[in-house]
Each structure stands twice: as C-alpha cells, then as structure tokens.
C-alpha cells in the first residue's frame, strides 16, 4: 500500500490486522519518506526524495543547477524496485518456514542506497562534491553527450583505454595530439576538441564511422525513435497495443514466458470477480455496490 503512514490502519487494513488473519502474509508499504522519522507524514515527490538523499546534487553539469533525472531515480529505482526486491525476499523466507513480515520501502532510503558506490567513492577521495567534474557525471570528456552537425546527439562511454583508443581513431585524432586520458587537468581541453570534432559531421555519418567498433558510441534517441532502432526491433523489445507503443516486460526468463497484457481492463471490470475470490457472497457484493463501497 502507498498511503501516508497511519492511513491503512485507520481503514482497518493495516499490517497488524492483516497479519493476524494470515501470519504468512508479506505486507509491502511504499512511501516517499518511510514509516518513521520527522518527515514520514509530509508530502513529497521524487525530486524531494532524491534531493534529500544525495543523488540530485551530483546530477548535472559543472557550473549549472542540478538536472532533474525524470522520476526514475526516486519513484521507480528507489521505490518500486526495492519494494519488489523486499517482497520477493520476504516470500522466499516464508517459503522456508518463516513468518510473513512488513516491508518498509521508502523512496528516500532507496535513492540513497542506489548511490552507495558514489558515497564510498566520495569518502575514499575518488569523487568530488563539485558537480560535473567526475568520471560519470559529464566531467570526463570520454563519458558525455556530444552534439553533431545535424543537431542530434551521441552518447560516449569510452572509459577503458582500449575503447578510448577506438574513440580517438574514429574521431581522427592521433593519440599524441590528445592529453593523457585520465589527467583531469586536461579534461576541459580534451572535451572542447571532442565537441568541435563531433560538430563537423552528421550523427548518421558518425554512426557509420563507429559501426562495428568498440568505441562505446551510441545515438541518443527519444521515445519516438528508440523502438525503431534495429537492436530493439531484432530483440522484439517493444510491442503495440491499442495503437500505443510500449516496452515489453523485463527481464527475460529462459523458461517462463512473459507476455504483456494486450488490453487494459476498464475500471471496476473485475470487482465482483475479485470479491467472490476472497469469499464474499453475492448478497454482500450487491450491498457493497449499493452503498458505494466499491464500484
């Protein structure tokens, strides 16, 4: 459930009542701030959670405000994925004879945990709090996004030396005319050279040059383009239903086939069926509808 702390209890649907009926139940609770703490009952959204947790301050370019990474880090990454992981772990425990338990999945906790490697790198002296000056935050010239002559963009991720050498070759640079890859004192200079060179050709031209190489160069595609890329079509990564293009379920399993639902149910379509499945009589269900308890 995703209410603020205490709401489910007021409805008589809190974990205490539910676990009393079924001690093996796994009760998942996902909130922004968690079930406890001074902010637990406060309103908030993804941007608030990742702001307090730490990641937001490190996303963006040097000398500019932090960039908002959609709602992927807090809502989906820090919230949903950790809730799912917690529920699955608790279900494994139940299958091994343990009792069910309550999962407190706070987006602020999950967002911080996603950034665990960065916290470690910072405390070890390998990561600066100055945004846009580090390896993975657009500080490095070989891990950034560059504009091409046509106005489209390329994503570059040539971290390892062998990949970096392929990048230099594709750009037409002799290794001797470019400063050492990992010398941060020259990163800005190198980035300017890369940016100027990428602007000399269209993205399609660069993709032909880097095709088949290990330069770690890929196009930056929008949601109207990504599903049309050959890699996506060959893997069948998207599907269409009711005229809407959507990603297929991930991950993929070797034995269990996962298929997307082709049609969405209308609101209330399965209400009676669900109530019957949990033991409610037809008279009770009719009463619920009449009183507006369900729809």
Where are these regions (language model features)?
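Beta-rich nucleic-acid/ligand-interaction surfaces
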Residues: 111, 186, 225-229
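A glycine-rich dinucleotide-binding beta-alpha-beta segment and adjacent secondary-structure elements
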Residues: 212-261
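Aromatic-enriched alpha-helical interface/lid elements that frame and gate functional surfaces
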Residues: 141-213, 217
